[in-house]
């Protein structure tokens, strides 16, 4: 078993300093945030996918410290009821897939997302019970949105060689435990 860490815990450090620090602690693998809530402190796919020199510098820095990248992490809410926010999170997640493809990884880590309770919602609505009946109706609506989104996203990921999508089970999102 190898020890790994999400690099965003030291997002205030440049990537090289972060990797040097992790190496000194015996860390062997890193999960690198590249959008959404983790931010892009150590990996900005929009830059690295289009600037070969910066991409090579990124790769060389990881290699210099003999680190393995376990996954690119892009936790957001691509089904947020605010369409602008949803589009931004979706773009980050798709860029994470493209970054994984370029780097030769087959996995990204993310959240499932959580829609609102109806088409006119402005904020996510995290429902954790199916009764009284109103909640069951909300869950039906939400899971339709969730499944439709993920069918499309999984197809995109597969087209780009990403065959593992790890959903972090987290409160506030539709997938928050093993039963969901």
Q: Model-derived features: where do they sit?
A:
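Extreme N-terminal starter segment of soluble prokaryotic enzymes
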Residues: 1-4
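Short polar catalytic/cofactor-binding loops
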Residues: 7-14
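Short, glycine/acidic-enriched loop or turn micro-motifs at the edges of active sites
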Residues: 11, 34, 171
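Catalytic domains of carbohydrate-active enzymes, especially glycoside hydrolases
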Residues: 16-38, 104-107
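Active-site acidic/histidine proton-transfer and metal-coordination neighborhood
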Residues: 17, 21, 56-57, 61-65, ...
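Glycine-rich, proline-tolerant flexible connector loops at the mouths of alpha/beta enzymes
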Residues: 32-58, 115-119
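Glycine-/proline-rich flexible loop or hinge segments
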Residues: 39-45, 73-81
